[in-house]
Curated annotation (Swiss-Prot):
InterPro entries: ClpP, ClpP/crotonase-like_dom_sf, ClpP/TepA, ClpP_His_AS
Keywords on record: Cytoplasm, Hydrolase, Protease, Serine protease
Protein's name according to its UniProt entry: ATP-dependent Clp protease proteolytic subunit 2
Organism annotation: Treponema denticola (strain ATCC 35405 / DSM 14222 / CIP 103919 / JCM 8153 / KCTC 15104)
HAMAP family according to UniProt: ClpP
Active site: 99 (nucleophile), 124
A Gene Ontology BP annotation from the UniProt entry: protein quality control for misfolded or incompletely synthesized proteins
Role noted for this protein: Cleaves peptides in various proteins in a process that requires ATP hydrolysis. Has a chymotrypsin-like activity. Plays a major role in the degradation of misfolded proteins.
Reaction it catalyzes: Hydrolysis of proteins to small peptides in the presence of ATP and magnesium. alpha-casein is the usual test substrate. In the absence of ATP, only oligopeptides shorter than five residues are hydrolyzed (such as succinyl-Leu-Tyr-|-NHMec, and Leu-Tyr-Leu-|-Tyr-Trp, in which cleavage of the -Tyr-|-Leu- and -Tyr-|-Trp bonds also occurs)
Compartments it resides in: Cytoplasm
GO cellular component, one term: endopeptidase Clp complex
Subunit text: Fourteen ClpP subunits assemble into 2 heptameric rings which stack back to back to give a disk-like structure with a central cavity, resembling the structure of eukaryotic proteasomes.
Gene: clpP2
Domain of life of the native organism: Bacteria
Amino acid sequence: MNFINETNEEKKNKTNDDDALMQKFLNTRQIILAGEINKELSEKIVRQLLLMESLSATKPIYIYIDSPGGDADAGFAIFDMIRFIKAPVYTIGMGLVASAASIILLAASKERRFGMPNSHYLIHQPLSGIKGVATEIEIHAKELEKMRVKINKLIAEETGTDEKKVAKDTDRDCWLNAKESVEYGLISKIAKNRKDIPEK
C-alpha cells in the first residue's frame, strides 16, 4: 500500500513539474517540437500555438525542431496553423530536421528560419508502406504523387531553388548540414547562440 501511495505521489509531482515547465514555455513563448510527427504531436503543437496567440498576437513564437519526421498530413496541420495565426513565428532547427519536420521548418518566412551549428536536414519524396489489392495501391500511388508534387513546389517556393532541381534532389534522400542548408535556402542563418535570433 505504501508503495502505491509513493508511486501516486511521484506521478502527482511529475505532473506538477510538467505543468510548471509548460507554463514557463508559455511565458517565454517557446515550443519544443521533438520526436515523431503524428496526430497527437500535431494537436499538442496546434493547441500551444493558438494559446500563445490568444495571449499575444504580436509577440513572436519560437519553435525548436528536432524530429525524424513522420506523418505528412500531421506536419501540414502544424504548417498551416503557423501560417494561420497572426503572431510571428520563428523556426529553429536543432539535431535532426527530416522529412515532414523540414516542411514545418519552412512554415516560417525565410528570414525567420534558423539552424543550430550541428543541425542537419533531410528532404525527400514522401514514403509509402501501403499494402493491399492492386486498385487500392493504385489509388494510394496517385495520392502519393500529388503529395510529392506539392512538397517539391513548396520547397522550391520557400527556398528559391528551381523546382526541377528540387524534384531531382528529393528523388532520393538529400542530406544537408547547417551550412549547406543556408546555401540551399532552407534556413537563413546559423544560430550559434541566442543573440543570433531576433527577440521581436
